[in-house]
Amino acid sequence: MQLAQRLCELLMCRRKAAPVADYVLLQPSEDVELRELQAFLDENFKQLEITPADLRTFSRDTDVVNHLLKLLPLYRQCQSKCAFLKGYLSEGCLPHTRPAAEVECKKSQRILEALDILILKLVVGEFAMSEADSLEMLLDKFSTDQASLVEVQRVMGLVDMDCEKSAYMLEAGAAATVAPLTPPAVVQGESGVREDGETVAAVSAFACPSVSDSLIPEETGVTRPMMSLAHINTVSCPTVMRFDQRLLEEGDEEDEVTVMSPSPEPVQQQPPVEPVQQQPQGRGSHRRRYKESAPQETLPTNHEREILDLMRHSPDVPREAVMSPTMVTIPPPQIPFVGSARELRGVKKKKPTAAALLSSA
């Protein structure tokens, strides 16, 4: 009966609310977010002294609040990550994982510092972040891939190794250049007047080691450093000759010549001798023949050249008596024809007969 009555009241909309019914008014989500933001600012930015009244003022500017609410979860995530890494580094960190943990901890600290600056700018009102800006782009500025850091560290190690090797090579090269070298001996003459009144000019020349004494006699008045002409032809070292001015006649300008070291004459190279073509030797071989070599020319020796130079410069010897060195032509040697060894001996080998073998036995 009560059920039918309730149904009629429901259809006729006559049902009244029960006196025991309790209704709860839910708060909007904005108030919850503002309280969470207030707790976050009180925890991390106490020095800013942001009050709830300030947050209500900020709530009028929806852009500032929205940006702060976007940064809030990211800031807490980086904060918890940094705290975990610091605890891991302080207690029980493995040696091979310490470099990676230190890098990640530094990255988290750098991101937290950047977020602190952003929050401060947003609260003060001197910074505005547009909706198009992405937080991922912001994180890319302060984060680096671990593989890239490892590659950079490896390259830096190679650069340091190359610097060490280069420094070692430079030091070794400098030590080699500073090593004492044996300088050539120097013969220096002193200018002055001898006891007999002879004027001597000051000369200096490079003296080559291991040279023989000069072949010029001292009676001629011509002196030369200790050096032989044979060594001059092979080694290009300058020499200066000293002479007595009294040997020259006064008024004879033709004989006044400057005595200088004789320049080495070019040596005439002999034509190469063709190799001997040997014929095959045998029983019926032909006689060996050698081709005639070119005529050999001999140059005057150093002693002869030096004597001729002295005779030219000496006033006591007439110039007509001095003969220039001539090339002496030596005829090629006459090589006789040579036959085989049997023909030279004049004995022919005979085969032993049977009768000779029996008689010898």
UniProtKB/Swiss-Prot annotation:
Keywords: Host cytoplasm, Host Golgi apparatus, Lipoprotein, Palmitate, Phosphoprotein, Virion, Virion tegument. Residues 266-281 have a biased composition (Low complexity). GO terms for cellular component: host cell Golgi apparatus; viral tegument. Residues 251-299 are annotated as: Disordered. A lipid is attached at C8 (S-palmitoyl cysteine). Phosphorylated. Palmitoylation is necessary for Golgi localization. It is found in: Virion tegument; Host cytoplasm; Host Golgi apparatus. Plays several roles during the time course of infection, including egress of virus particles from the perinuclear space and secondary envelopment of cytoplasmic capsids that bud into specific trans-Golgi network (TGN)-derived membranes. Oligomerizes. Interacts with UL103; this interaction mediates UL103 incorporation to virions. Belongs to the herpesviridae UL51 family. This is Tegument protein UL51 homolog. It comes from Human cytomegalovirus (strain AD169) (HHV-5).
